Amino acid sequence: MPLNLKNFIKNQALNSKMSDFQDLDHIDGASISAVCANLYNKPRDDLVMFYFRDGANYASVYTQSKIVSENIKWNLSIKSKKIKSLIVNTRNANAFTGPDGYKGLKEIAQEVSIQLSKKQVEDEDYPKRVLANEILFGCTGTIGEKYPTEKIKKHIPELIKKIKYVQNKPIWMKAALGIMTTDLKPKLAMEECKIGNTKVKIYGIAKGSGMIFPNMATTLGYIFTDADLSNDILSKLLKKNIDTTFNAITCDGDTSTNDMVSIFSTGKV
């Protein structure tokens, strides 16, 4: 789908231009895809995949709500040391959907497992099977509606076909736009620094507009680095910084079932 900011950005921010945003480019080991799965019944990307062909170390923090969405339950059940894929859908929060919502995620993960394993065979010298328990989910949107499992499953082959191994600013922008719900504009940022004499990249995208209280409500944030950092270090870094960043935001006094901030390390530097 062509990248048209007007399909995503609200009227209050229609004067936004690509030049207003930082120039995120390539992070080795991370691949991106975004498609329209027709979750909104209009032409906009609403399903986004991040694919780590060699796996990525990771850490996450989640909502402090006692009631959580089905994707948070799924993510909390994952015990894999490395993650192969993160899939984010908009329009539907998969909250208050019960066993059917969780079952839907399992079906999607199994389909992604099959399709990405095929891609490994096609693209890699030493292919490895991608397992369903190496996949994380982010869901955001309306609470209490039936989860659109079949719509999402139907678009998994297209999502994988459109994976871009080399990223650039438009691809990162598609991902940032693709996870938006009521946001006025996309949220993406980058920083580069040195660890010793080695330059590393830290990129991130996020969404969140209303219901931001307390501690991240209705916020999704995804951070990516090519630095070689262990799960333990990533977890410590995330927990150390979350209180002065995502947990410091308040918007309208409501909380959410779906908060999620994750950091992924491809370990390529």
Model-identified regions with their sequence ranges:
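Glycine-rich, mobile lid/loop segments that gate access to catalytic sites or pores
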Residues: K106, E111-E122, Y126-F246
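Glycine-rich phosphate/diphosphate-binding loops and the adjacent beta-loop-alpha structural elements
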Residues: R91, D228, D259-V269
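Short, histidine-centered active-site or binding-site loop motifs used for metal coordination
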Residues: T90-N92, G141, A206, G267
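Glycine- and Gly-Pro-enriched alpha-helical subdomains that act as flexible
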Residues: T245-D252, S265-V269
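Short glycine/threonine-rich loop-to-helix capping motif typified by GTGT followed
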Residues: P99-G101, G144-I152, S265-V269
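Glycine-rich phosphate/pyrophosphate-binding loop regions near the starts of catalytic domains
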Residues: F50-E107, N133, G138, M211-L234
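N-terminal amphipathic/basic leader segments beginning at the initiator methionine
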Residues: M1-Y62
